[in-house]
UniProtKB/Swiss-Prot annotation:
Signal peptide range in chain numbering: none
Stated name of the protein: Small ribosomal subunit protein uS3
Higher taxonomy: Bacteria, Pseudomonadati, Pseudomonadota, Gammaproteobacteria, Chromatiales
Matching InterPro entries: KH_dom (IPR004087), KH_dom-like_a/b (IPR015946), KH_dom_type_2 (IPR004044), KH_sf_prok-type (IPR009019), Ribosomal_S3_C_sf (IPR036419), Ribosomal_uS3_bac-typ (IPR005704), Ribosomal_uS3_C (IPR001351), Ribosomal_uS3_CS (IPR018280)
Gene Ontology terms for molecular function: mRNA binding; rRNA binding; structural constituent of ribosome
Encoding gene per record: rpsC
UniProt domain KH type-2: residue ranges: 39-107
Length: 226
C-alpha cells in the first residue's frame, strides 16, 4: 500500500518555512520543543472559534515572538485589545520569557487547507452529508482561484457500521513537484458514531517557475473511495 509523505515536511527549506524558528543547544532543545507544543495547544484551545490556521514561534535573544495566522483577527484581539493582552500574559507564563504576539489576517480562508478541513469537520458534526460538505469546500476553493484541491474523509461516514474513506478532487494536486505550493491541513470531526478524519490538499500554483503555471481546470473532477 502506498503512503503519502507529509507535504509540508517534504518542502521544508525549498518552498515551505519552519513553524518554529530558534536555535538551541542539546541541553535546551527538548525543553523548547515541549514548550512550543504546549503553547500551540493552549492557543488553539483558547481560540477554538477564531479560525486559527498556523502559529509561528520565534525566540530572539531571551524573548519570544508568536505570530498567529487567523481568518477572524477581531475575535483574537478583542474589545480595545483586552483579549490579546490577556493571551500575551498567559503565553508569557507558559514560556517563561517576555512574549510579543503578532496577528496575521488570512484574506481567503477558503484557500487555507487547515481552515477548509476544520470547516468540513464542523459540518460533519452538524450531521451534514459528507459528500455535500466536500463538494461545497472544493467548489468554494476553485471559485476563489485554487488550481486544484483534494478533500479526503475517513471513518464511520453517515454512521455506517464499517469505517471507510472517500475523497473528492478537482483540478491538479501535484504532490511530487517540490516547487508546487501545496497547502495541507488536517482536522477531526467528533460525531456520535466516532471520530471522522478530514485531510485537505490545496494547490495554489508553482512558486519558482511562475511563468509556466498550468491552467486551473486542467483535469476534471474525480471522485473515489477506498
Amino acid at each position: 500500500m502506498g503512503h503519502k509523505v507529509h507535504p509540508t515536511g517534504f518542502r521544508l527549506g525549498v518552498t515551505e518555512d519552519w513553524r518554529s524558528m530558534w536555535y538551541a543547544g542539546s541541553s535546551n532543545f527538548g525543553e523548547y520543543l515541549n514548550t512550543d507544543l504546549q503553547v500551540r495547544n493552549f492557543i488553539r484551545k483558547k481560540l477554538a472559534h477564531a479560525s486559527v490556521s498556523r502559529i509561528r514561534i520565534e525566540r530572539p535573544a531571551k524573548n519570544a515572538l508568536v505570530t498567529i495566522h487567523t481568518a477572524r483577527p477581531g475575535i483574537v484581539i478583542g474589545k480595545k485589545g483586552e483579549d490579546i493582552d490577556r493571551l500575551r500574559g498567559e503565553v508569557a507564563r507558559l514560556m517563561g520569557v517576555p512574549v510579543h504576539i503578532n496577528i496575521e489576517e488570512i484574506r481567503k480562508p477558503e484557500l487555507d487547507a487547515k481552515l477548509v478541513a476544520e470547516s468540513v469537520a464542523q459540518q460533519l458534526e452538524r450531521r451534514i452529508m459528507f459528500r455535500r460538505a466536500m463538494k461545497r469546500a472544493v467548489g468554494n476553493a476553485m471559485r476563489l482561484g485554487a488550481q486544484g484541491i483534494k478533500v479526503h474523509v475517513s471513518g464511520r461516514l453517515n454512521g455506517a457500521e464499517i469505517a471507510r474513506s472517500e475523497w473528492y478532487r478537482e483540478g491538479r494536486v501535484p504532490l511530487h513537484t517540490l516547487r508546487a505550493n501545496i497547502d495541507y491541513g488536517v482536522a477531526e470531526a467528533h460525531t456520535t458514531y466516532g471520530v471522522i478524519g478530514v485531510k485537505v490538499w490545496v494547490f495554489k500554483g508553482e512558486i519558482i517557475d511562475s511563468d509556466a503555471q498550468p491552467a486551473a481546470g486542467g483535469e476534471g473532477a474525480r471522485q473515489g473511495k477506498g
